[in-house]
Amino acid sequence: MILEFESHLRDRGETPEGMLWIPGGRFRMGSEDFYPEESPVHEVSVPGFWMDRYEVTNAQFERFVAASGYETLAERPLNPADFPGAPEENLKPGSMLFGKTGRAVDLKNYTNWWVWAPGTNWRHPRGPRSSLEGLELHPVVHIAYEDAEAYARWSDKELPNEAQWEYAARGGLDGKKFTWGDEEFPDGKAMANSWQGEFPWQNLLRDGYEGTSPVGSFPANGYGLFDMAGNVWEWTSDWYVARRGNEVKACCSPEMSPRVATAEQSYDPGQQQFRIPRKVVKGGSHLCAPNYCLRYRPAARQPQMIDTGMSHIGFRCISSQPAPAGLHTR
């Protein structure tokens, strides 16, 4: 579905509302210490850009929908041809919803905690009978890739590529495990909305939240950006490949904010029946736990089918608008 939206961004040269300037520079992208898809570490050069200070909220997305009449993918019926053999119930409009289990389960089978929930979408984020009451400042969820793109176009912005996102998330702390340093709980303090305890059945709520949290509830990183770790995963514009292999240069030869792979390369080899491209999502979420998904780190990356929104995936935007005159852009 292609829609044309009227841009309402300010005149060029002004500071984009709600955004921060991320000065360009070089950094070491990736990690060798956690999951194989994060390697190899390689040096990347990223020009400066603007980035949303916060993840896009329900209130912001509601204004977009009111102005544009946009309907998200989760609100539209599914095409049976795209899902051969799927039960009729699963073809109704809906989204993937997390369900906490009552006991320890097989962590290799995600269907133990993810269910297709008809009637669930961004307006009803916790199931078909839920609402946005009290969630206005929480990140919008159940957003497929094209939904995030549509919002970005309407805002005269775009989605970050993976290198831009990771560079911004690090906040100037090159090579650190987390967006705030190497210690997960400095001085015993929770720095992000993640899962403490045994996923997916025991959440100790050390950070104070069972699900998503209002944006900005945890400390900002070195660039002043909030929730670059945890809360919700965030879409990037890059197609997913199971890390770079020989597609990247050596660490001593920096790339310019690389975009690699094609849609065809991003298909899931383990699900040949679904020829659905996948994008990279970054940042981890409130469902990430050390025993299952220690991915609330800047180097972490996951594939996500572009047609699927979930209760732990949102986004933020960037802008290539020039920096204000006199601002140090290095």
Specify the residue positions occupied by each region the protein language model found:
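A short N-terminal beta-strand-loop micro-motif at the entrance of redox/enzyme domains
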Residues: 43-49
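Acidic-aromatic/histidine active-site loop/patch
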Residues: 57
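Short, P/G- and charge-enriched loop/turn segments at secondary-structure junctions
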Residues: 7-9, 36-41, 108-110, 267-269, ...
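N-terminal pre-domain segments of enzymes
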Residues: 1-13
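Functional-site microenvironments in short loops/helix caps that host divalent-cation chemistry
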Residues: 21-22, 28, 32-33, 77-298, ...
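An anion-binding catalytic pocket shared by soluble metabolic enzymes
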Residues: 52
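Short capping motifs at secondary-structure boundaries
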Residues: 49, 64-73, 155-156, 323
